[in-house]
């Protein structure tokens, strides 16, 4: 299976983030996906099996986990992209840190495209507006690289207010103790 960089028509690079993740015991996309599930991406818990030792958010913050899952050097994986998108929208993420990491890791085009999808679902959420404003538009991502936009959202059919589709970005639940 080709890497995400290859599917995007980009060359790979020596990644400081990937070196940090590996040094923290997270050596592949599968271990990052396990960590994402442990950190609250329970929506995807049936996607991966097993656990990984969580190095802690002081060593691997959720912003780094998000960009790590979206990293172009891993083998292309729709599940990793979906979990990376969920972690991108985590409630306590620092938008400026996400921006810096996206630039450093050559993920600007991908993060901008996810922000565009996020904004279409949650136009009032400040993260999506910030990323869209700050990241350059380098054109569309080739078809078939990203999962369909509906794979990044949860939709309801019937709510307390009655019938109607309500969409929201899938993001990690807050994990307590």
Show the residue positions of the predicted features.
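Charge-dense, extended regions
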Residues: 122-177
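Short, charged recognition helix plus adjacent turn
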Residues: 17-38
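Short linear sequence motifs
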Residues: 14, 36-37, 145, 162
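Detector for methionine-enriched segments
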Residues: 1, 10, 33, 83, ...
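Mid-protein regulatory/catalytic core that forms ligand/cofactor-binding pockets
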Residues: 44-140
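Basic, Lys/Arg-rich alpha-helical nucleic-acid-recognition elements, primarily the DNA-binding modules
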Residues: 1-23
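Generic intrinsically disordered, low-complexity segments enriched for polar/acidic and small residues
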Residues: 2, 40-41, 127, 149
């Amino acid at each position: 299976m080709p890497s995400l960089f290859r599917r995007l028509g980009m060359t790979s690079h020596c990644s400081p983030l990937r070196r940090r993740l590996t040094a923290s015991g997270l050596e592949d996309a599968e271990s990052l996906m396990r960590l994402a599930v442990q950190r609250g991406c329970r929506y995807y818990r049936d996607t991966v099996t097993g656990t990984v030792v969580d190095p802690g958010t002081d060593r691997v913050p959720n912003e780094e986990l998000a960009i790590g899952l979206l990293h172009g050097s891993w083998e292309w994986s729709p599940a990793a992209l979906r979990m990376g998108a969920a972690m991108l929208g985590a409630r306590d993420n620092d938008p400026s840190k996400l921006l810096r990491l996206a630039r450093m890791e050559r993920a600007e085009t991908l993060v901008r495209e996810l922000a565009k999808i996020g904004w279409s679902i949650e136009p009032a959420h400040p993260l999506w507006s910030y990323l869209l404003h700050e990241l350059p538009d380098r054109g569309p991502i080739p078809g078939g690289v990203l999962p369909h936009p509906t794979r990044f959202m949860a939709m309801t059919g019937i709510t307390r207010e009655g019938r109607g589709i309500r969409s929201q970005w899938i993001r990690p639940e807050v994990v307590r103790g």
